[in-house]
């Protein structure tokens, strides 16, 4: 199961990309209308990405999207909808990446783990960026 979208009622909450999915040239795993685009490129030696810039493109960020890449270790990941109903649970390991678009999530490290997180800014300060589930 290399690519697992987690969706409910046609809305994507998360995307798990595990292992090394087969890619020819370039493959984006996100839809064009998502606020955050994630793809994998495989290019041969000598392939050149021509010098370029990305023009200013202002848009409103409705909800923060998180991208996590697991460099080492493993974790159990649970994805929730907006009402904290569990949608999906999966173990991820080194080399896997996932994207959280909306809803909630939790991670439990199963061993010493190193991961890289990427998300939109600006950072508005502690206490403003997360809503925790009430116990």
PLM regions: where:
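Double-stranded beta-helix
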Residues: 6, 106-135
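Compact, glycine-rich, soluble single-domain proteins
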Residues: 55-58
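Short acidic-glycine-tyrosine-enriched beta hairpin
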Residues: 81-102
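A short, compositionally biased micro-patch
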Residues: 44, 70, 93, 100-101, ...
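Short, conserved beta-strand element in jelly-roll/cupin
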Residues: 40-44, 60-77
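A short, N-terminal "cap"/entry segment at the start of jelly-roll beta-barrel domains
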Residues: 1-42, 135
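Short beta-strand His + acidic residue motifs that chelate non-heme Fe in jelly-roll/DSBH
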Residues: 51, 77-78, 98-100, 104-110, ...
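Conserved hydrophobic/aromatic beta-strand scaffold that supports enzyme active sites
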Residues: 40-42, 51, 67, 89, ...
